[in-house]
């Protein structure tokens, strides 16, 4: 305990710099988390709007997920899915 109390009392330039840097990092992360929350709410609103306009939200989410994938990866996934569906007599 004495060492942590001594560290708190250490007001050297290096310690002050580290404390300021840590504080800055924490504040940046907090600000980004707030922005992320706002963006998530905006995305939720867009999905609600699209649903109100008659679009299938589940299909939209699937399209968004597929567009993020590498085209080769997506094609492989679709091929495997088709193979499994054929094996199960679904197509």
Swiss-Prot record:
Any one GO MF annotation of this record: DNA binding
Pfam families xrefs: GapR_DNA-bd (PF10073)
NCBIfam families tied to this protein: PRK13694.1
Family: Belongs to the UPF0335 family.
Annotated HAMAP family: UPF0335
Protein name in the entry: UPF0335 protein BRADO1188
Source species: Bradyrhizobium sp. (strain ORS 278)
């Amino acid at each position: 305990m004495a060492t942590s109390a001594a560290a708190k009392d250490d007001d050297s330039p290096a310690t002050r710099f580290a404390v300021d840097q840590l504080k800055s990092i924490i504040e940046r992360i907090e600000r980004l988390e707030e922005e992320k929350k706002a963006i998530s709410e905006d995305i939720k609103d867009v999905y609600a709007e699209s649903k109100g306009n008659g679009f299938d939200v589940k299909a939209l989410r699937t399209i968004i997920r597929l567009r993020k994938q590498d085209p080769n990866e997506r094609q492989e996934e679709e091929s495997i899915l088709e193979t499994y569906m054929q094996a199960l007599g679904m197509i």
